[in-house]
Every structure is written in C-alpha cells, then in structure tokens.
Amino acid sequence: MAIDDFSRELYADILPDKTQHSAACFLTSTVAQCPYQIDYAYSDNGKEFKGTDSHAFVKACRQHGIGQKFTRINRPQTNGKAERVIRTLMDMWHSKIHFKDCADRHIQLLRFINFYNTVKPHKSLNNATPYEILTAYFNQPICKQL
C-alpha cells in the first residue's frame, strides 16, 4: 500500500508475495494512477524495498524520479501514517467482510479504497476526505509573478 503524506490518499493492492519485483510492479502501477509527482517512497527497511542499484524496487524508483527514505530500524512508529492506514484497513475492511474468493477480495479492496479516499472523513484532515483535500489543492488559482 502507498499513502500520500499530504492528502492521505490511499493506493493499495493485493500482491502475490513480498518480493522486490512485486513491490516494483506496485510502485509502477501507483505512479501510473497518481495524478501528481511522487517525490519520495518512504518505507521500512525490508529487503523488498532496499538494495543495490540492480534491485528491482530501487531501479523502479530511479526510473520514475522517486527518491527513497527509510524508517529507523525496529521503529515502525516512525512511519505512523502508514501503520495507521494498515490498522484501518484491517479494522474496517479485512476483519469485517467475508470474501467469497480471491477475485471478490480484490473487488472489495477496490471498493474500500474508493470509500477511504472519497467518503470517509479523516480526523487528521479536519474531517475532510483525501479527495476533498486534493480537489481543493488542484483548484487553487495559479498566481503569475510579475
């Protein structure tokens, strides 16, 4: 999963495994969907995110002009926003819904992401949704310098 630090917009998918290749594919998919520039990928120190220049996720970050930052080792609270979203996913989606099969699980995840981004008020955003925050941001007038 990925979350925008500014708007709390959520991107998530069900990956086949925790490998660098799956993480790189998810990043590429997120970049394709995201309407704004991603400056940094902030992650834990897992082997799926960190490695040499030949590492698939490192290469994907570089190809998309995305820098990498990492949490302090054994300190998941340094990535508190992501940890909170994971808890919300587990509380509001995963533990509440009985999935018929893998396809249904994926459909239900997409529905939850839509709900999370467009309907669910966020206390950290003064009860706005990520969609409302992004809409307000992109609707700002562009000022020209004289």
Residue spans for each PLM region:
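Short, acidic, Ser/Thr-enriched surface-loop or helix-capping motifs
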Residues: 4-5
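Short small-residue beta-strand/loop micro-motif enriched in glycine and branched aliphatics
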Residues: 9-13, 69-71, 95-96
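Active-site beta-loop-alpha junctions of metal-dependent nucleic acid enzymes
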Residues: 12-36
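Acidic/histidine-rich, metal-coordinating catalytic segments
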Residues: 18, 36-52, 74, 126-131
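Residues at alpha-helix caps and immediate loop-helix transition turns in enzyme cores, especially N-
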Residues: 23, 53-54, 81
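RNase H-like polynucleotidyl transferase catalytic core
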Residues: 42-46, 61-81, 98-102
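Short, aromatic/basic amphipathic alpha-helical patches
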Residues: 52-61
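C-terminal domain-tail junction helix/linker
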Residues: 64-66, 88-146
